[in-house]
Amino acid sequence: MYKRQGKDFLQKKAFELEIVNTLIHYDVELVVMAGWMKIVTPFFINKFKNKIINIHPSLLPAYKGGSAIKDSILNGSKITGCSVHFVEEEVDSGSLIMQAALSIRDDDDIESLSKRIQMLEHKILPHSISQAGFLIRTNFMENY
């Protein structure tokens, strides 16, 4: 079940269509997926090709998907961080806009590392939005 503004949707396609229509209605130039935690369909991506960005809690291409923080700890990584990238059909695979790194401490657990990464995300997301806007407005993404 998908919900949007108190409205229930049984199918993902109907849910995405509602969102797409709303974004088109408001002539949205950039879609920012921060905390979205859902994989969008090719239908959605193609409606806003090169105009969707996502923030992800790892230094991509390492640790794609929903368990990036847990995986970085379990694999004994010493450094992690966050990445902002353009959204493509393959999960966490689009062109990188910006990354920031931090050390994983010996006493870090999923909760403590998540909080530290989130603080880093809050620092780079505004700059990434500005950079993405520049790339879109100058049509740079066609050759990116």
Residue ranges and their predicted role:
Residues K3-Y144:
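One-carbon transfer enzymes
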